[in-house]
Structure formats: structure tokens, C-alpha cells
């Protein structure tokens, strides 16, 4: 089998209408009221966040008692304390009560139910849409992040809370000021609309975005980390973001590496070698 034939097979599979259609038909026909609710995207992202944080939180709580996992800790001498975990939990809870829940209720009250298209996206459209949204968000947040580090007032007023800790951990992902949380939520909601994504693609992007954001802050460089699965240093991952918390004027892009390399803010990072 030639390389061209392999690529053709992958392309044909990715562009087949029928691959995702059975899944989409099932959820659309059996759970339409839930999916059409303006509350659904909010519930999806919030629940995804807490579910995805839990495994990393377990790693932080068990710490050195779990050597098979602890050997992948990027900064092994800096485990989050109980006080740090409680502080980040409190900030996250405060933001959700003050900002996320009221915004969700407002959408539920004033936004009409969302129509569900009958046709599912192709697999290629789904993957391309998720990737496109991540790349667009990466540019937006790179600019926002750069400005909030370079302009002192912006940093102190809005972003400094996220840099309370030089060694990131999963619960610190949403240890954010209200302005930053609103900005991130706005882009996450707007970008799929700008890219005219299918609803299934939009929801998949939201879950993937939550996952990679939590992974970036987890403080562990596992063999299955996204940055190790994507070759050529295109994707930064937890090691890259860990360096940002140690050297705050570097590595501003949240996920990928190209913007920092283009604008001279890239700081080299080494993938952690597991300790024996």
C-alpha cells in the first residue's frame, strides 16, 4: 500500500457523512430539549472542568505517596499545600457564583432555544473546527496575555492573582480574576460562531479546550501529555506553561509555540525526565 493510498483512505473516512451521523441522530432525537437549552454549553464546560481536574487533584493530594505518578512532577519540590488548594477552590467557586451562574441564568431567560441541524459534521470538519478554534483562541489570548504582562496596571488589576504560584497545579487553572474569566468565556463562545462551526464541533471544542487548559496547569509532564503526542515542538503543554509561571515574561501563548517564537518571547523548556 502506497503512502498516497493511505492518505486517500484517511481522507475518504474523514469526509464520509455517515461516520458521526448515527451519534448525532441519537443525541438529537433523544435529548433535544437538553441540547437546545442555552444552559447546556455552560453546564458542559463547568462539569467538564471539575471532572478533568479531579485526576490531577488526586495526584497533588497523594503527592510523594504515589511515586509512580510523582516521578513525572515538573517541579518535584513544590507540591500545592492544603491552603493553596482551598484558596484556588474558593476563587473558582466565587467566580462561578458571581459570574458564571448569573450569565447562565440570563442566557436561559432571554436566549431562545438553539435549533439543531439534522446533518452531522464530517469527522474532518469536526477535527478541523476544533483545531481552528484552538488556533484562533491561541492568538487572542497571546495578545491579551502579552498586554496584561507588559502594562503594569493591567497585570496588577486583572492578572496577578493567576501568578500567585510559581509552580502550577490543576486547581489553579481557573484561579483567575473576573475580567480574565469573562474574556476567556467570551472568546470560547464567540469563536465557533465566527468559524461557523456545527454545534457538535462547538461542544467538542469546549471540552477539548477545558482539557488542554487543565493539562497546561497540571504540573506533571506525563508520557501521554498532548505536547508529547504532537511532534516538532508545535504544542507547548504543561512544561512550556510551567516555565511561564517561573519566567512570567515568556511563553505567553496558552497552547501552541509559534506566536512566542515569532515575537521573541519563547523560552526553551525541556520535557521532564521521570525520576527513578
From Swiss-Prot:
Its EC number is 1.14.99.-. One of its GO terms (cellular component) is endoplasmic reticulum membrane. The gene is ch25hl1.2. The lineage of its organism: Eukaryota, Metazoa, Chordata, Craniata, Vertebrata. This is Cholesterol 25-hydroxylase-like protein 1, member 2. Disulfide bonds: none annotated. A motif (Histidine box-2) lies at residues 159-163. It is found in: Endoplasmic reticulum membrane. It is an enzyme of class 1 (oxidoreductase).
